[in-house]
Amino acid sequence: MRCSRNGFTLIELMIVVIIIAALAAMVAPNLIGRADEAKEKIAEGDLAKLKIALDLYRLDKGSYPTSEQGLATLTVPRGPGQEPYLDKPALDPWKRKYLYRFPATHRSYGYDLSSMGRDGKEGTEDDIKNWE
């Protein structure tokens, strides 16, 4: 009488688990850093889009919005039957408002525009800004 073998032995299952754990340990550090890097690239792209909207505003109005008006003024329709410069208020990838100042304090012309970055604190090295 022959004994048929069904399923895997405990040793075989343990080897598979060890292999999967080793692969995860090698891949995970690369994936974790990529999410933050992707958010930084999105913020840089957002700053470029905001620059276009601000430049269009300046062409229409003769000046950039004041710091008090802020970026929110870009979501107001330009005039009767006209679309706003932005469809919705601009939030960075960390769901915080972009910082806007006009006149600029970090540049000799124009405006300052920045995201506080991952840490949410202004003036730290992870900030994404339109100067430097």
Where are these regions (language model features)?
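Residue-level recognition of hydrophobic positions within alpha-helical transmembrane segments
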Residues: 8, 40-42, 51, 123
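Short, contiguous strand/loop micro-motifs
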Residues: 3, 40-41, 78
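Aliphatic-rich helix starts adjacent to a transmembrane/signal segment
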Residues: 30-49
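Low-complexity, acidic interaction segments enriched in glycine
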Residues: 48, 52-132
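N-terminal single-pass transmembrane signal-anchor helix
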Residues: 4-31
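Generic secondary-structure boundary signal with a strong preference for alpha-helix termini
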Residues: 19, 33-36, 107-108, 131
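Conserved amphipathic alpha-helical interaction elements at protein-protein interfaces in regulatory
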Residues: 3, 33, 37, 56-60
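Short, contiguous, well-ordered secondary-structure segments
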Residues: 1-2, 108
